[in-house]
Amino acid sequence: MLIEQPPKILRWLYPSALWRMDTNEKAVYLTFDDGPIPEITPWVLDLLDKYQIKATFFMVGDNVRKHPKEFQMVVERGHRVGNHTFNHIGGFRHLSYNYLENTNKADELIKSNLFRPPH
């Protein structure tokens, strides 16, 4: 089952991005958005460690720039990270060029094939 269909131009612009998952696999994907946040991210990581759970953190590039220590903690503890744009901008409220530029700026810091658009 595919819940959300991204615009085809995004697939063309980002061919190495992960666009689909095997839907026959029985799995739960735990995700967090908008981090890293110094007051919250370490607490979440400790809780995930306690229960031996891995998650994916969709990071805002500007937050990664401001809080590199917390970003590195997520990576070092074996969690996946994904791009959530640099300034958490929603695509429908911005010109395509500006949106892609903002996404690419975040990608310079995050370097992931995972992307979640902000709502």
Residue ranges and their predicted role:
Residues L2-F92, K105, L109-S112:
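Active-site beta->alpha N-cap acidic-glycine motif
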